[in-house]
Amino acid sequence: REGVITINALEADPEFRIRQQLATKEKHRSVTGHFRHESGHYFWSILAMEPAFNQEFKLIFGEETLPYAESLEQYYSSGPQPNWREAYVSPYASSHPTEDWAETWSTYLMIRDAVESALSCRLIEGDPENTDFSYQLSIWSRLKFALQQINKGLGFDGVEEFEVNPSTRQKFNFVESAIGY
């Protein structure tokens, strides 16, 4: 149905989630992350009705009309594009332009949530009222390091690692402008 996002409830089960992580090669797969990702697809379907959005989308993310099933089959059989860190927030984002959008959207929301939570709880210094994404990215770089150390100290995997470079920054900025934040 239109506007319905379906997430398999089994993903909340740790054993199932680990099997999914291994099967999909997504080290940081979580229910919350999957929901963010799928919400990106939903909002893309709405935003893609606007010609101006589509035009800019193609310039930044690529041609969304590339054969989707073939792109995913290629990704799962051969892996991500070798240079994925130079242009994408995750290996999976390199599989298809709409997956790149959904992964970027999801990562954008994760950064906003983590930074706003850390600032609100005063875990890191900064202005919780400043919603400028460039400012929040600068906070994220400090917060990410702290989260890596805390997680490793507790015996957990670190947080997702991705490069904030001109390509990913441009994609984050496009997501933010599309949201109208």
Regions found by a protein language model. Give the residues of each.
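Short glycine/proline-rich turn/loop motifs
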Residues: 16-23, 82-89, 126-128
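Pan-zinc metallopeptidase signature
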Residues: 92-181
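Auxiliary, metal-adjacent structural segments of Zn-dependent hydrolase domains
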Residues: 1-14, 25
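Active-site recognition of the HExxH zinc-binding catalytic motif
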Residues: 29-49, 102
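Generic structural hydrophobic/aromatic packing signal, biased to beta-strands
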Residues: 4-9, 37, 57, 84, ...
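Post-HExxH zinc-binding segment in Zn-dependent metallohydrolases
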Residues: 46-115
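Short pre-active-site segment immediately N-terminal to the catalytic Zn-binding motif
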Residues: 14-36
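Short, positively charged
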Residues: 13-15, 77-78
